[in-house]
Structures are given as structure tokens and as C-alpha cells.
């Protein structure tokens, strides 16, 4: 059975993610408030950002930058 949540990205009830895809408290918030479709949109945007800004996910500063972008993308609409 699909998990239905109120997606804060789309501002409507939507199918939730199957599992917590990001660690920690932020991951829990994403799992509880961001739909599967919204998370897919973020993954697409993340890929674009990594490529455009030539980010290296082994670099801690670059990972922090992506996390900042993720928070803005998912929660500041």
C-alpha cells in the first residue's frame, strides 16, 4: 500500500517515498513532507547543479553546498 503524505513541495496530498533517502533529521523531514515525485524533481535538479558547477561529492564543502540547494529547492517554494 502506498504511503500518502501532505507534500510541502506541491502543497497537496501525494504518494510518499518508500524509504528515508537522506540521513539524519533532515532526511526524516524529507521522508515525512516530500513526495516521491518531488524527490525525483530534486534528483534531476541536483544532477544539473553538480554538472553545471562541477561539484565533487567527495568534497565536504561541495556536499554542504548541495544540501543548501536541496533545502532551498524542497522547502522554500
From Swiss-Prot:
GO terms for molecular function: iron ion binding. GO terms for biological process: cellular response to oxidative stress. Gene3D superfamilies: Fe(II) trafficking protein YggX. Keywords: Iron. GO terms for cellular component: cytosol. It comes from the Bacteria. InterPro entries: Fe_traffick_prot_YggX (IPR007457), Fe_traffick_prot_YggX_sf (IPR036766). HAMAP family: Fe_traffic_YggX. Could be a mediator in iron transactions between iron acquisition and iron-requiring processes, such as synthesis and/or repair of Fe-S clusters in biosynthetic enzymes. Belongs to the Fe(2+)-trafficking protein family. PANTHER family: FE(2+)-TRAFFICKING PROTEIN-RELATED. Monomer. This is Probable Fe(2+)-trafficking protein. The lineage of its organism: Bacteria, Pseudomonadati, Pseudomonadota, Gammaproteobacteria, Enterobacterales.
